[in-house]
Amino acid sequence: MKGNIWTIGDVQGCCAPLAELLAHPEIAGDTDSRFWFAGDLVNRGPQSLAVLRRIMAMGERCTAVLGNHDLHLLAAYAGVRKPSKSDTLDEVLQAPDAVDLIDWLRFRPLAHYEAGHLMVHAGVLAKWDVAKTLALAGEVEQALRGPNWRKALQKMYGNEPATWKDDHTGGKRMRVIINALTRIRLCTPSGHMEFATKVAPGAWPAGLVPWFDVPNRATRDVTVVFGHWSTLGLLMRPDVICLDTGCVWGGALSALRLHDRKLVQVKCKRFQDPNGD
């Protein structure tokens, strides 16, 4: 496909900053461009419904991977999980076009690879190369797109197993895949996921490292693009790009043109206090 690719970080229901970002001359003038969204389109911000409608209307110009908040919306719609006090999903759940929006969301990928860039919401396990990541993401995608998608969502909650084994089956297998792609931040050097620690970057306890610094990570030969980690903020290395710059927390919404790493940001109003989600 032709056109520049602009990758956008976590929107989290902040439609006004998204509209401002897309109207930026550098982006709006790029008429053949395509847009990648690194997940968490919804929740915590005030306009999740407007965000979904706008991104859905982009059609084939848009590729959006599922984040943990997007999966939470699916679970809330399915009756698997009740919204919490900090959620801002009621407008979507009660919308007249909710069925269409939920069906569109169910058919989003959990991983996307193109032109040397692998996009996921949170990260990948060190043992997984690009092919493995796409294959495992595909297993979950198939379940979410199938007739029993509500039952599939019941299996995704929990922190265990914390590591990958090829012989995992059923709910354990799905849970590891979802947790790695949509929730991971820190790991042990051997690749065990750790979800209890919520500290500022660089202040994590001995024995824990960011998932992208686990030794011998199999995706280090490509660039992994992700969001999810607002306290980490903007990170640009040859092998990883983090684009969650805390839009909903009063930070910025960021877009990066992949081929030359041109960065465009818009400042955002603070809608909620950071709480590690």
Curated annotation (Swiss-Prot):
Function noted in UniProt: Hydrolyzes diadenosine 5',5'''-P1,P4-tetraphosphate to yield ADP.
InterPro entries linked: ApaH, Calcineurin-like_PHP_ApaH, Metallo-depent_PP-like
Family (UniProt): Belongs to the Ap4A hydrolase family.
One annotated GO molecular function: bis(5'-nucleosyl)-tetraphosphatase (symmetrical) activity
Upper classification of the organism: Bacteria, Pseudomonadati, Pseudomonadota, Betaproteobacteria, Burkholderiales
The entry's keywords: Hydrolase
Reaction equation(s) it catalyzes: P(1),P(4)-bis(5'-adenosyl) tetraphosphate + H2O = 2 ADP + 2 H(+)
EC number: 3.6.1.41
Name of the protein in question: Bis(5'-nucleosyl)-tetraphosphatase, symmetrical
Pfam families (alphabetical): Metallophos
Top enzyme category: hydrolase
